[in-house]
Amino acid sequence: MAINIRKTHPLLKIMNHALVDLPAPSNISLWWNFGSLLGLCLIIQILTGLFLAMHYTADISMAFSSVVHICRDVNYGWLIRNIHANGASLFFICVYLHIARGLYYGSYLYKETWNIGVILLFLLMATAFVGYVLPWGQMSFWGATVITNLLSAFPYIGDMLVQWIWGGFSVDNATLTRFFAFHFLLPFLILALTIIHLLFLHETGSNNPLGINSDADKISFHPYFSYKDLLGFFVMIFFLAVFALFMPNLLGDAENFIPANPLVTPPHIKPEWYFLFAYAILRSIPNKLGGVLALLFSIFILMLVPLLHTSKQRSTIFRPMTQIFFWLLVANSIILTWIGGQPVEQPFIMVGQIASISYFSLFLIIMPLTSWWENKILSLN
């Protein structure tokens, strides 16, 4: 009998257990495609970023011009830049859908996998933030100034911390250089953590829509889910191509086509769309330190979700009341995203404050209480 090298070779054996002979639940739906889509996004971002870094100059006198040079003079530089910029948006769409899937089907009960996922989200946000500063446009400069300034809210060490990150007394050349270094380094850290994320996932196996043990009904990942993922790849690449080729600047800010000028403040300073929900929460609290803590907690609250799970069932598929509140949370997050892009005036301030209170209430109070109430109803039968 011929030896199957896929199953015996020390390196290929690891790949085989992760991608070919991996036992997967037979009933996982399209919502389980986003993990592999995120892997594809990461590879696209690293490759396009690598080619952009070859032509980019991390110096405040040349950064903006070097981006213009990439778009005008480098072969397909405009395409690489458009794919990289819109790929980031697509990355965040996939991340948010991946998290929503985890919340809906109770995947957060794999605590190690979930917590590493939250750390990955935080690193992804950090990478996107420092990357947005690199073109050195108006919104790049003022976004960096406003967001880094938030650290000054921390008592005693705040001002020192801000100047340490800036590398001086304002956002300047030292800031841009270190942000470029971080933007180059962090994706590789994300890649390493992704492997650990997968390692913990394969310890327990994938969850499934019913939220029950699927050991009795597993099928191999290849060819069933490898082809299913391939369909997702083509759909995502199609949307990425549509955005990169037909509307590359739709999700960006027009203000960033103006070179950075420390003497002129843009009328509305706002981050990219994928940060707007957290930015709205930050702005809804009048106290600076309170706002910063709420901003951090809006992401790290995800780490509390496994501890706040009070239901006897894992998935929300058989819990209609929890489903209603889950979709309320989705709608609430969309409202926060909209509010984050609006000017700081009434009625947006009030709507933002109500949406921020609702966001935390749904996670901390409403959903755990609803699950407890559903348990009571089930025990009556």
Swiss-Prot record:
SUPFAM superfamilies registered for this protein in UniProt: a domain/subunit of cytochrome bc1 complex (Ubiquinol-cytochrome c reductase), Transmembrane di-heme cytochromes
Chain positions recorded as heme b b566 binding sites: H98, H197
Keywords: Electron transport, Heme, Iron, Membrane, Metal-binding, Mitochondrion, Mitochondrion inner membrane, Respiratory chain, Transmembrane, Transmembrane helix, Transport, Ubiquinone
Record localization: Mitochondrion inner membrane
Cofactor note: Binds 2 heme b groups non-covalently.
One Pfam short name: Cytochrom_B_C
Cellular component, GO annotation: mitochondrial inner membrane; respiratory chain complex III
Keyword Membrane assigned: yes
Main location: mitochondrion
Alphabetical list of CDD domains matching this protein: cytochrome_b_C (cd00290), Cytochrome_b_N (cd00284)
Transmembrane stretches, start-end: 34-54, 78-99, 114-134, 179-199, 227-247, 289-309, 321-341, 348-368
Keyword Plastid recorded: no
Topology in membrane: Multi-pass membrane protein
A single MF term (Gene Ontology): ubiquinol-cytochrome-c reductase activity
Any GO BP: mitochondrial electron transport, ubiquinol to cytochrome c
Annotated binding of a ubiquinone, by residue: H202
Gene3D superfamilies: Cytochrome Bc1 Complex, Chain C
Superkingdom of source: Eukaryota
Cofactor(s) this protein requires: heme b
Other comments on record: Heme 1 (or BL or b562) is low-potential and absorbs at about 562 nm, and heme 2 (or BH or b566) is high-potential and absorbs at about 566 nm.
Family: Belongs to the cytochrome b family.
Role, per record: Component of the ubiquinol-cytochrome c reductase complex (complex III or cytochrome b-c1 complex) that is part of the mitochondrial respiratory chain. The b-c1 complex mediates electron transfer from ubiquinol to cytochrome c. Contributes to the generation of a proton gradient across the mitochondrial membrane that is then used for ATP synthesis.
Subunit organization: The cytochrome bc1 complex contains 3 respiratory subunits (MT-CYB, CYC1 and UQCRFS1), 2 core proteins (UQCRC1 and UQCRC2) and probably 6 low-molecular weight proteins.
Name the record gives this protein: Cytochrome b
Organism annotation: Carcharhinus plumbeus
Gene this chain is encoded by: mt-cyb
